[in-house]
């Protein structure tokens, strides 16, 4: 049965991985691509790194701790550790975004956004504002939605349907209710919280959004982390955006 809401939903905020595209895309495609390309990018730099370099990679990497900037080996070990431990480091996110940009632009990467998510964003953008909130950098978000795999296998740019983007540097960490309060203030809905709907696969993020006054649902896609019985009782859950009645 489609899920409806007591108050009209005027704004939708979407998570990315596990919500609009398979959670496996990041872990089995984007992360490995980054780690595959990283060694050659780091070995091309001159050490010790300088923040005033004309190289975008060197400029980003110069923000990492001084003790890991002494050689390509130490920097590779450090960044690889951040990736493998899924550390939400803003500098790492910037570096990943730059390398993914190269991959998207040369056609090696395309985002497998769910068909129902493409329909949802395309149709709802005509009458509502749609924002993205992800732990990935805003640049990475724009790249992903700018290179969505279309029905014919060619990349499609969906950014024209989106009203804005948030990441951990602009809104805060996604499991903290204050981050959603910041978004509400930024979009002018701090007094109309229930008119905003946040969709995510992560129950802690959904709980944080609810604490901030938003409507929020858990998206249960194939491959996502299994939901506990307690979660199933505590949260409203959808398996596809077609389950929503807005």
Swiss-Prot record:
<dbReference type="InterPro" id="IPR027511">
    <property type="entry name" value="ENOPH1_eukaryotes"/>
</dbReference>
<feature type="binding site">
    <location>
        <position position="17"/>
    </location>
    <ligand>
        <name>Mg(2+)</name>
    </ligand>
</feature>
<keyword id="KW-0963">Cytoplasm</keyword>
<feature type="binding site">
    <location>
        <begin position="134"/>
        <end position="135"/>
    </location>
    <ligand>
        <name>substrate</name>
    </ligand>
</feature>
<feature type="binding site">
    <location>
        <position position="201"/>
    </location>
    <ligand>
        <name>Mg(2+)</name>
    </ligand>
</feature>
<feature type="binding site">
    <location>
        <position position="174"/>
    </location>
    <ligand>
        <name>substrate</name>
    </ligand>
</feature>
<dbReference type="InterPro" id="IPR023214">
    <property type="entry name" value="HAD_sf"/>
</dbReference>
<dbReference type="GO" id="GO:0019509">
    <property type="term" value="P:L-methionine salvage from methylthioadenosine"/>
</dbReference>
<dbReference type="GO" id="GO:0005634">
    <property type="term" value="C:nucleus"/>
</dbReference>
<dbReference type="InterPro" id="IPR023943">
    <property type="entry name" value="Enolase-ppase_E1"/>
</dbReference>
<keyword id="KW-0028">Amino-acid biosynthesis</keyword>
<keyword id="KW-0479">Metal-binding</keyword>
<keyword id="KW-0539">Nucleus</keyword>
<dbReference type="InterPro" id="IPR036412">
    <property type="entry name" value="HAD-like_sf"/>
</dbReference>
<comment type="function">
    <text>Bifunctional enzyme that catalyzes the enolization of 2,3-diketo-5-methylthiopentyl-1-phosphate (DK-MTP-1-P) into the intermediate 2-hydroxy-3-keto-5-methylthiopentenyl-1-phosphate (HK-MTPenyl-1-P), which is then dephosphorylated to form the acireductone 1,2-dihydroxy-3-keto-5-methylthiopentene (DHK-MTPene).</text>
</comment>
<keyword id="KW-0486">Methionine biosynthesis</keyword>
<dbReference type="GO" id="GO:0005737">
    <property type="term" value="C:cytoplasm"/>
</dbReference>
<keyword id="KW-0460">Magnesium</keyword>
<keyword id="KW-0378">Hydrolase</keyword>
<feature type="binding site">
    <location>
        <position position="15"/>
    </location>
    <ligand>
        <name>Mg(2+)</name>
    </ligand>
</feature>
<dbReference type="GO" id="GO:0043874">
    <property type="term" value="F:acireductone synthase activity"/>
</dbReference>
<comment type="pathway">
    <text>Amino-acid biosynthesis; L-methionine biosynthesis via salvage pathway; L-methionine from S-methyl-5-thio-alpha-D-ribose 1-phosphate: step 4/6.</text>
</comment>
<comment type="similarity">
    <text>Belongs to the HAD-like hydrolase superfamily. MasA/MtnC family.</text>
</comment>
<comment type="subunit">
    <text>Monomer.</text>
</comment>
<comment type="pathway">
    <text>Amino-acid biosynthesis; L-methionine biosynthesis via salvage pathway; L-methionine from S-methyl-5-thio-alpha-D-ribose 1-phosphate: step 3/6.</text>
</comment>
<dbReference type="GO" id="GO:0000287">
    <property type="term" value="F:magnesium ion binding"/>
</dbReference>
<protein>
    <recommendedName>
        <fullName>Enolase-phosphatase E1</fullName>
        <ecNumber>3.1.3.77</ecNumber>
    </recommendedName>
</protein>
């Amino acid at each position: 049965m489609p899920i409806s809401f007591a108050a009209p939903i005027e704004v939708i905020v979407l998570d990315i991985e596990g919500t609009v595209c398979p959670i496996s895309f990041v872990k089995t495609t984007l992360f490995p691509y980054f780690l595959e390309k990283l060694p050659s990018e780091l070995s091309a730099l001159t050490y010790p790194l300088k923040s005033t370099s004309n190289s975008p990679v060197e400029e980003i990497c110069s923000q990492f701790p001084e003790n890991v900037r002494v050689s390509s080996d130490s920097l590779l070990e450090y960044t690889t550790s951040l990736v493998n431990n899924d550390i939400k480091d803003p500098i790492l996110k910037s570096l990943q975004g730059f390398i993914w940009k190269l991959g998207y632009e040369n056609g090696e990467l395309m985002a497998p956004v769910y068909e129902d998510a493409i329909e949802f964003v395309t149709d709802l953008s005509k009458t509502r504002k749609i924002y993205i909130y992800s732990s990935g950098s805003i640049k990475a978000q724009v790249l992903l939605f700018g290179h969505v795999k279309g029905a014919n296998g060619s990349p499609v740019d969906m950014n024209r349907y989106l009203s804005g983007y948030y990441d951990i540097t602009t809104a805060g960490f996604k499991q903290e209710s204050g981050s959603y309060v910041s978004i509400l203030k930024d979009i002018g809905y701090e007094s109309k919280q229930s008119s905003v709907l946040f969709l995510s696969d992560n129950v802690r993020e959904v709980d944080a959004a609810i604490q901030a006054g938003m409507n929020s649902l858990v998206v249960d896609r194939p491959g996502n982390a299994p939901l506990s019985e307690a979660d199933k009782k505590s949260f409203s859950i959808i398996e596809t955006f077609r389950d929503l009645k807005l």
